[in-house]
Each structure stands twice: as C-alpha cells, then as structure tokens.
Amino acid sequence: MSSFLTPAVYSKNGLENQWINTIWNTHDLMCGCNNAIKHLFDILKKKGEQLCLPSTTEDAGTQTHGEEKDYDLEEGDLDALFANDFEEDDG
C-alpha cells in the first residue's frame, strides 16, 4: 500500500459535499446546462434500475482460491507468437 494513503481530512458531511462537487465539476466539463443533479438523475432514469455496473457475485480482490487459467496456452506459445515481431537490432 502506498505510504501517501492517509485518512481523509474531511468529515462525513465534508466527504459527501466533495462527492457532490466532483459530480458537478465533471458535469461542467461536458455540458453547459446549469442543473448537473437533474441531468444526472435524468441519465440514471434512462438507464433504468441498474445504478451500478454489474459484477461477479464475489467482491473484487476477495478471491482466495488458487490461480485460475481461462486460456489454452502451453509453455512456449507466447515466445513462438512473438518470435517474428522484432529482432535484437530493432532497438
């Protein structure tokens, strides 16, 4: 973990305000209307009930099982695949 990662300097209310400010500011980068929140809700309404991107049933980073292979590569296949792509003199 990074040594720069420290607890937030904002209170719960301050964090919520910063989140709203972030939404407002990123909206202003792409749109000139004066109602970012209404614009956001309109987009969310069009997207339907799906408020978050779908994911697996497991939380990211919590898998504890061994390494899974979802590919059919044998040892040396990648070397053979990239063997003709470049030579030592290519820099």
From Swiss-Prot:
Pfam families: TT_ORF2-like. This is Uncharacterized ORF2 protein. It comes from Torque teno mini virus 1 (isolate TLMV-CBD279). The lineage of its organism: Viruses, Viruses incertae sedis, Anelloviridae, Betatorquevirus, Betatorquevirus homini1.
